């Protein structure tokens, strides 16, 4: 296990195949939200490869992002790849009031996971005092950023049936769900983009 300390208001950590973007949120103690991002290279352009007389034996490796050399000639991925395509992104944030940092980092997310500490409208004052978000505030953020789907989580222990509030929450954002432990979702690349 390698620990990495977040030392800025926003910080990006790159790993093999994805990156983690941490961003500061607004809670009573230091707290961060996160976006997990898988970037996606552009499509392989066979015509460009042939035009530039790039040996076929290198095509696959160039598609994977390698830079290669043969007989003093350097071959780079940008020689054969088109414009970067839309990847995948999941943004997650709890223990916070609504913030601009959430809105900025949730742009383009395929799945937005936010706290819905309170479902009762009369708990807004309590949410503000304790630096949490209501389900309705989370739904408003999802609507503002154009998220395709919102999972609410991090409920108050006093809220035993969060799904009871979903009809009202969906009036703000129709694709909102009261998430449960163990939920999974398969995200796929959009082949049209």
Question: Where are the regions that the model predicts?
Answer:
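General small-molecule cofactor/ligand-binding pocket signal
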Residues: 1-7, 21-23, 177-179
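Short, ordered loop/turn segments at secondary-structure junctions
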Residues: 117, 155, 181
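Metal-dependent phosphodiesterase/nuclease catalytic metal-binding core
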Residues: 7-152, 161-167, 189-193
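A short helix-to-beta-strand connector/capping loop
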Residues: 1-2, 15-16, 87-88, 172-175
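Short acidic, glycine/proline-enriched helix-loop-strand junctions
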Residues: 160-183
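Positions that flank functional sites
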Residues: 121, 157-158, 184
């Amino acid at each position: 296990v390698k620990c990495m300390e977040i030392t800025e208001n926003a910080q990006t950590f790159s790993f093999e195949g994805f990156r983690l973007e941490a961003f500061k949120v607004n809670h009573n103690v230091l707290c961060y939200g996160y976006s997990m991002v898988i970037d996606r290279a552009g499509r392989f352009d066979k015509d460009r490869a042939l035009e530039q007389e790039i040996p076929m034996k290198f095509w696959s490796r160039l598609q994977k992002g390698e830079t290669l050399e043969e007989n003093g000639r350097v071959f780079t991925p940008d020689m054969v790849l088109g414009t970067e395509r839309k990847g995948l992104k999941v943004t997650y944030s709890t223990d916070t009031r609504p913030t601009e940092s959430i809105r900025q980092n949730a742009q383009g997310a395929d799945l937005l996971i936010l706290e819905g500490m309170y479902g009762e409208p009369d708990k807004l004052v309590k949410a503000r005092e304790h630096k949490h978000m209501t389900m309705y505030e989370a739904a408003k953020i999802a609507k503002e950023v154009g998220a395709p789907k919102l999972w609410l989580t991090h409920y108050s222990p006093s809220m035993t049936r969060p799904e009871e509030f979903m009809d009202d929450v969906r009036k703000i954002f129709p694709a909102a769900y009261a998430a449960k432990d163990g939920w999974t979702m398969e995200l796929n690349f959009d082949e049209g983009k």
